[in-house]
Amino acid sequence: MSYTIEGATGAWELVIGLEVHAQVISQSKLFSGAATAFGAEPNSQVSLVDAALPGMLPVLNRECVAQAVRTGLGLKAHINPVSRFDRKNYFYADLPQGYQISQFAHPIVGSGTIEIELQDGSTRQIGVTRLHLEQDAGKSLHDQDPTRSFIDLNRSGVALMEIVSEPDMRSPEEAGAYLRKLRTILRYLGTCDGNMEEGSMRADVNVSVRRAGEPFRTRCEIKNVNSIRYVMQAIEAEAKRQIAIWEEGEEVDQETRLFDPSRGETRSMRSKEDAHDYRYFPDPDLLPLVLDEDWIEGLKASLPELPDEKSARFVSEYGLTRYDAGVLVAEQASAHFFETVAKGRDARLAANYITGDLFAVLNRTGRSITDSPISAEALGGLLDLLADNTINGRIAKEVFEAMAETGEHPADIVEARGLRQVTDTGAIDTAVAQVLEANPDKLAEYRSGKDKLFGFFVGQVMKAMQGKGNPALVNEALKKALG
C-alpha cells in the first residue's frame, strides 16, 4: 500500500528527490595537490589554487575522475565519453574564487538506477539522473567569537560527486533506504567513506506533495542534511508544512530551507535559485574531459563484487534468506566476517549467530564488527564444537556470552568451566530414571495419553544434567523409558 499523509481534506502523496554530495576518496583535491585529510588544523591544507590567488590554474586530478567513473559503473549508469567543466557563479565568503567549478550541461555520468529493499520485503528501482564532479567550498565558522566569523579553506577544492536521483521516492522510508543503499555501494567501491557525521556525505532533499495522480506541484529543497534519520524527519515535517499551506488555499513558494532537528521543523533559508541565476559557462581554464573506452573498460573489470551481486550469491551459494543476506552485505566487513565463519560450516547457523547474537553484542557495546570482541575464527570454533557434539545449543549460548565478555577461545571456556556435553548413555539413563521416579503423577498422566508432557520430562532431565545432556540422546532414552 502506498504511503500517504492524511490532511484535513484528504490524503496527500509525497514526491521526493535527493541530491547527494559525496566526498571523493583521494589523497589530493580535484584541481590541486593539497591534502584532503579530515580534522587537520584550520587552513593547513590549502594550496595557492584553493585560495584562488591570481594566476593560479586548475590541474585536473586523474584519480578523482577514475573514482567518479567507478561510482557511475557501480550505479549501472552510462559513462559519458566527453564531459565538460563549467563555472557556477555566486558569492559566498568561503568560496574564494567567486565561482565553483562544476559540471552543468555535460556531466561525467548519465542515468543509472539503484534498487532498494523496504521493510516489508518489497523492492523498488530508483532512477539516478546524473553524477557530476565539482569542488567543495570552504567552511564558515560562526561560533568561535561573538562578533566575528572565521573561514577554514581546508575543504575548499575537495572533490565532490553530486549524485542526483529522479523524483521517484514516495515516503521517508524509501528515502532512507535509498541513502543507505547508496552509501553501501560507495563504500564497497572505495569511492566515498559515507561518514555523514564528518560531512563526507550530505543530502539536499527535494520535497513536494500532490493528490494521487496529479502532476508535480511546487517543490522545496532542504539543504545539507547530515544524517539519514534527519533526512527522514525533514521529509515528514516539510510535507506536513506544505499540506497545511495547500489546504488553506495558498501557494507553496519554491525556496531553499533548513531542517532544525531540535524543533522538528524546516525554516526558510532563501528563495530557490534556477540555473540562470548562477550564470553557468564553460570554464576557460579546463579542456573538455575525453575518456578512452579501453580505460573505462579497465575500471569496470577492476570493480569489486557489489552488494546486490554479493547478496544474490549468499542466497544461492549458502542458502540464506534474502533478508539475512541483505543484512550481512550492508557492510563489507560483516559480509567478509560471515564468509570467514561460514567456510566449511553450517552457513545458515553462522548467519543466525552473526545477525542475532553477535549484532546484539555489538549494539549493546557500541562497537562495529571490525572491533568485535569475538573474532570470526573464534565464532567458527564455537560452531565446530556444536557440529562435533562437544556442546549443545543451550551450552553454546552460554559459551558465546563468555566469549563476548572475556575474548577467550570457545574450547578453552568449555574446558575451564566443564561444559562438555554428556553423551554417556549410562549417565543419561540414570538421570531419566531419577526424573521419572520423582514425578509419578506426571508419569501416570503421560501414560494415560497426555503426550505433551514429553517436553516436561525432557526439560527436567536437562535440568538434572545442568543442561549438558545431548538432546538427541536424552529424547531417545526418554522414549525408551516411557514405553
Swiss-Prot record:
Q: Does the keyword Ligase apply?
A: yes
Q: Please give the superkingdom of this protein's source.
A: Bacteria
Range of residues in the leader sequence: none
Q: What is the lineage of its organism?
A: Bacteria, Pseudomonadati, Pseudomonadota, Alphaproteobacteria, Acetobacterales
Q: Which organism is it from?
A: Granulibacter bethesdensis (strain ATCC BAA-1260 / CGDNIH1)
Protein's UniProt name = Aspartyl/glutamyl-tRNA(Asn/Gln) amidotransferase subunit B
Can you cite a GO biological process for this protein?
glutaminyl-tRNAGln biosynthesis via transamidation
Summarize the subunit comment: Heterotrimer of A, B and C subunits.
Q: Which family does it belong to?
A: Belongs to the GatB/GatE family. GatB subfamily.
| Keyword terms, alphabetized | ATP-binding, Ligase, Nucleotide-binding, Protein biosynthesis
In its keyword annotation, does this UniProt entry include tRNA-binding? Answer: no
Described function = Allows the formation of correctly charged Asn-tRNA(Asn) or Gln-tRNA(Gln) through the transamidation of misacylated Asp-tRNA(Asn) or Glu-tRNA(Gln) in organisms which lack either or both of asparaginyl-tRNA or glutaminyl-tRNA synthetases. The reaction takes place in the presence of glutamine and ATP through an activated phospho-Asp-tRNA(Asn) or phospho-Glu-tRNA(Gln).
- The EC number on file is 6.3.5.-
Gene Ontology molecular function, alphabetical: asparaginyl-tRNA synthase (glutamine-hydrolyzing) activity; ATP binding; glutaminyl-tRNA synthase (glutamine-hydrolyzing) activity
Name the PROSITE patterns on file.
Answer: GATB
Q: Which Pfam families does the protein's record reference?
A: GatB_N (PF02934), GatB_Yqey (PF02637)
- The kind of enzyme this is, by top-level EC class, is ligase
InterPro entries, alphabetically? Asn/Gln-tRNA_amidoTrfase_suB/E, Asn/Gln-tRNA_Trfase_suB/E_cat, Asn/Gln_amidotransferase, Asn/Gln_tRNA_amidoTrase-B-like, GatB, GatB_C_1, GatB_Yqey_C_2, Gln-tRNA_amidoTrfase_suB_CS
Q: Which reaction does it catalyse?
A: L-glutamyl-tRNA(Gln) + L-glutamine + ATP + H2O = L-glutaminyl-tRNA(Gln) + L-glutamate + ADP + phosphate + H(+); L-aspartyl-tRNA(Asn) + L-glutamine + ATP + H2O = L-asparaginyl-tRNA(Asn) + L-glutamate + ADP + phosphate + 2 H(+)
NCBIfam families reported in the protein's UniProt record: gatB (TIGR00133), PRK05477.1-2 (NF004012), PRK05477.1-4 (NF004014), PRK05477.1-5 (NF004015)
